[in-house]
């Protein structure tokens, strides 16, 4: 469940000031202060700090309280200081140093607070301290603080900020060379830039060193070599190796290990081994780092056995594996399904006295999660804590990712809460995992996670928006997907192939092929190269729309653009031809596929078998099936189900059961469609007892029935009671009219008779099915029976099914009550139903009830932009309910909702044209 976050201040349009814009203004003001030492005032960093996010609304009260405490003697013994120390943040310290504080006290306090294990200075707190010290004429200690500031960089932004500040100090003539950068400072700065891969900035700093006539040393050159090698740019790195020799210096082990790393980054292992083998010849001992780089390179290339051989040879070279060496191998073995070998290495590691570190444990936890061994993963997390190792964000993310991939979102949320309870903040990756997980079942909850990200000032990235766009598209919310695309652009994020692939694929699946084609045609102008997935989606879309000729033209266009089709592309066309009854052409296309070097897949055979069976050509269909087996192409559940469905349709249940037996013999598990086909087959023959036997087999194998399975069983029970219905009335409508609660009770009793005890999932699917056919009266009775007689609490899916059914039947008061009940138990109502409900209430003149429902939705943690999109713009706005549009907009503003600039503009423009 998405928990409600406190409403934010509404500022209408939102925006941010670029860090670079702020940096440009950094030293724009001079203030001269009289002093016994001749000096000029150094500009405060406070303008920059004002643009940084504050951690608390009362962040300025903390610095003033600190100033009051520090102005007294023996301040370090103050009980008030000790009571507030855990709440002091770097932003508070930055603000404190910008106040009228004695510089010596500031230095002492800086040292005192840094002794607190929970506190870490930021580059901004150090910058504020530097400003204070420089303005008071300090020199020697400034060099020390500047080095500490450089070393404290935690991000690219920090590194660029520090670089700009150091340049200002270095070039400001007012300081009369007192604060010029010396070799140690230059090297530390290079090291900081190298950590974040800022090689262009490193090169500029190197050139500035030369301009300042500061002579580079071996450490300088090695940092340059290492910086380029981290990015795999060995050519540029080798230029600095040449400079080492030109300077009369000798490359050392750091130089060579960097080169080995660089070649491994480029996957040029031959060159890496060449450097490795030359090291002893150059009088340079090969160390553990060199070995580990090579072992890592071999592992990345999936040459794990060679990596293990090199690992064994380390001891012959009097080198001993480090924790990183072991971890690299353990990770690779885990990723190659060689987990027993990985565990043996962990055991060997501990026996040799090398303790696994956080990264080692993270690798093992990730591996256990990939095997769905979550209990063992949690045990390992506990072991870490017992051994005094504090899991980091990456460790928790491994668990969160594992849970989300298996649809266990609530467990993932529990891990996030555990992580936060240990003073670790979720990062972009954490939220991205949650968003991906929620998108599989409830995109509105995923949007709520985006809301939380923005609240906490965690920046969404391309992956965030791609996942949300994909989720909205899969839910059929294309308007929301397009708006997210615009928001993405507004935030300076560039949509990539994945963004558009998802949209094009979903549009095609929703039979909006022309719209998908228009989007596809716009990609060249956007600088995005169409890929095989996009072409395949369009080809499949045209085929499913019965436009096989257009699909062929798209294939030709694909080939003309040198985009090679894959087996999925051909399968889409073969399926289109088969659906059109053109089996001969489909077979010829299969032959063409083989000629260009693409082997037919299981899906290819299954598509052709399906057509043969549809044409009644059982012999050729079975012959192709046998060819699959003899050629080593293993038929899948879909292949077997194709036969079973056809046999059931023909009333040949013995043949269907025979195919089920073959399926099990060949190690293929029947799926939902397989069992449902058999249930329908027996039901159509009036053999309902056999149908319930199949339901029992289904449950025993762990395959949960769907709502359609239960509808099928209800249909057969009704047919036994009333006979088969004839006439023009659609089957679902007929079932809805005939179904009574007694029929559902009979179904439940039959389930118990056949040892299929109804559980929460059974009731959930049953209610979903009954709501789908529009029988709200029976659905409500089953809903009550489930709670009162079985003690089962309704799931969010059940509530939303009832809500949707109420809305479709225009029972708005009942729908409003369902919304109230959902919110009361912490469930999230589907926005599409809420849109229909609120519009319905306003149209009936019940605007107070409509406003009340909307007010309640604001407390649920939805992404506020999405609420505005779905309810106000696409709901009451497009329905021509102008008064409701402005009323609901006003409600959001009064509740402190904060919109993106794009959404705010749409709201200001007023209701869109009515449709």
From Swiss-Prot:
Repeat recorded as keyword: yes
Keyword Manganese: no
One Pfam family per UniProt: PPR_3
Keyword terms: Repeat
PPR repeats: from-to residues: 182-216, 217-251, 252-286, 287-321, 322-356, 357-391, 392-426, 427-460, 461-495, 496-530, 531-565, 566-600, 601-635, 636-670, 671-705, 724-758, 759-794, 795-829, 830-864, 865-899
Source organism superkingdom: Eukaryota
Cited SUPFAM superfamilies: HCP-like
PROSITE patterns listed in its UniProt record: PPR
Protein family membership: Belongs to the PPR family. P subfamily.
PANTHER family in alphabetical order: MITOCHONDRIAL GROUP I INTRON SPLICING FACTOR CCM1, PENTACOTRIPEPTIDE-REPEAT REGION OF PRORP DOMAIN-CONTAINING PROTEIN
Descriptive protein name: Pentatricopeptide repeat-containing protein At5g65560
Taxon lineage: Eukaryota, Viridiplantae, Streptophyta, Embryophyta, Tracheophyta
């Amino acid at each position: 469940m998405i928990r409600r976050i406190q409403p934010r201040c509404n500022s209408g349009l939102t925006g941010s000031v670029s860090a670079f814009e702020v940096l440009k203004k950094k030293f724009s003001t001079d203030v001269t202060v009289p002093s016994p030492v001749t000096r000029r005032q150094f500009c405060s960093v406070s303008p920059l700090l004002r643009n940084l996010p504050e951690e608390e609304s009362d962040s300025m009260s903390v610095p003033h309280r600190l100033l009051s405490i520090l102005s007294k003697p023996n301040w370090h013994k103050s009980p008030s200081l000790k009571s507030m120390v855990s709440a002091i943040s770097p932003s508070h310290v930055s603000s404190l140093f910008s106040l009228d504080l004695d510089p010596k006290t500031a230095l002492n306090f800086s040292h005192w607070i840094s002794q607190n294990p929970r506190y870490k200075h930021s580059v901004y707190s150090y910058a504020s301290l530097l400003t204070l010290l420089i303005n008071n004429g300090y020199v020697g200690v400034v060099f020390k603080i500047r080095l500490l500031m450089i070393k404290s960089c935690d991000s690219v932004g920090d590194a660029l900020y520090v670089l700009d500040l150091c340049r200002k100090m270095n070039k400001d003539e007012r300081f009369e060379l007192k604060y010029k950068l010396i070799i140690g400072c230059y090297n530390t700065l290079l090291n900081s830039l190298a950590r974040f891969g800022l090689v262009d900035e490193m090169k500029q700093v190197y050139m500035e060193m030369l301009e300042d006539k500061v002579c580079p040393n071996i450490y300088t050159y090695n940092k340059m070599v290492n910086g380029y090698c981290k990015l795999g740019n060995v050519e540029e790195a080798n230029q600095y190796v040449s400079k080492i020799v030109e300077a009369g210096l000798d490359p050392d082990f750091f130089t060579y290990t960097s080169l080995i790393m660089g070649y491994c980054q480029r996957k040029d292992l031959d060159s890496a081994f060449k450097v490795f083998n030359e090291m002893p010849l150059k009088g340079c001992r090969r160390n553990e780092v060199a070995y580990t780089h090579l072992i890592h390179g071999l592992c990345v290339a999936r040459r794990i056995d060679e990596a293990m051989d090199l690992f064994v040879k380390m001891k012959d070279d009097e080198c001993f594996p480090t924790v990183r060496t072991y971890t690299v191998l353990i990770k690779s073995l885990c990723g190659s399904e060689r987990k027993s070998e990985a565990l043996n290495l962990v055991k060997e590691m501990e026996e040799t006295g090398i303790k696994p570190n956080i990264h080692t444990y993270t690798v093992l936890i990730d591996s256990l999660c990939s095997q769905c061994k979550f209990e063992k993963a949690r045990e390992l997390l506990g072991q870490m804590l017992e051994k005094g190792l504090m899991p980091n964000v990456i460790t928790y993310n491994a668990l969160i990712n594992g849970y989300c991939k298996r649809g266990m979102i609530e467990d993932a949320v529990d891990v996030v809460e555990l992580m936060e309870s240990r003073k670790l903040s979720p990062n972009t990756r954490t939220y991205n995992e949650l968003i991906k997980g929620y998108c599989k079942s409830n995109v509105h909850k995923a949007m709520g996670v985006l809301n939380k990200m923005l609240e906490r000032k965690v920046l969404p990235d391309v992956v965030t928006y791609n996942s949300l766009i994909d989720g909205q598209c899969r839910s059929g919310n294309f308007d929301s997907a397009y708006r997210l695309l615009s928001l993405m652009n507004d935030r300076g994020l560039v949509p990539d192939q994945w963004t558009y692939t998802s949209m094009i694929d979903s549009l095609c699946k929703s039979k909006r092929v022309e719209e998908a084609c228009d989007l596809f045609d716009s990609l060249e102008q956007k600088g995005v190269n169409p890929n095989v997935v996009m072409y395949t989606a369009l080809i499949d879309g045209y085929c499913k729309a019965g436009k096989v000729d257009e699909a062929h033209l798209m294939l030709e266009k694909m080939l003309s653009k040198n985009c090679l089709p894959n087996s999925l592309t051909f399968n889409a066309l073969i399926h289109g031809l088969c659906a059109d009854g053109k089996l001969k052409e489909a077979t010829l296309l299969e032959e063409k596929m083989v000629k260009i070097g693409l082997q037919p897949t299981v899906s290819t055979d299954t598509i052709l078998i399906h057509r043969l069976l549809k044409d009644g050509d059982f012999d050729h269909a079975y012959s192709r099936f046998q060819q699959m087996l003899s050629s080593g192409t293993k038929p899948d559940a879909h292949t077997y189900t194709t036969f079973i469905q056809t046999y059931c349709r023909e009333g040949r249940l013995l043949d269907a059961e025979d195919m089920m037996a073959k399926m099990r013999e060949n190690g293929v598990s029947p799926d939902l469609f397989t069992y449902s086909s058999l249930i329908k087959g027996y039901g159509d023959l009036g053999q309902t007892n056999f149908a319930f036997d199949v339901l029992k087999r289904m449950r025993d194998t762990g395959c949960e029935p769907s709502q359609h399975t239960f509808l099928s069983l209800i249909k057969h029970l009704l047919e036994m009671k009333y006979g088969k219905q004839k006439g023009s009335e659609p089957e679902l409508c007929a079932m809805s009219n005939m179904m009574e609660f007694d029929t559902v009770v009979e179904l439940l009793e039959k389930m118990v008779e056949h040892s299929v005890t109804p559980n929460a999932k059974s009731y959930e699917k049953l209610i979903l099915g009954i709501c789908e056919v529009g029988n709200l009266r029976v659905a409500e009775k089953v809903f009550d029976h489930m709670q009162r007689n079985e003690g089962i609490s309704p799931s969010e899916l059940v509530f939303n099914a009832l809500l949707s059914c109420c809305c479709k039947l225009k029972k708005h008061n009942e729908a409003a009550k369902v919304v109230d009940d959902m919110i009361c138990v912490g469930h999230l109502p589907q926005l599409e139903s809420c849109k229909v409900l609120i519009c319905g209430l306003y149209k009936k003149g019940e605007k107070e009830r409509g406003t009340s429902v909307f007010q309640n939705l604001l407390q649920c943690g939805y992404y506020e932009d999405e609420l505005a999109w779905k309810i106000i713009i696409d709901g009451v706005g497009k329905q021509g309910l102008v008064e409701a549009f402005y009323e609901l907009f006003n409600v959001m503003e009064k509740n402190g909702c904060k919109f993106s600039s794009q959404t705010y503009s749409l709201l200001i423009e007023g209701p869109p044209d009515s449709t």
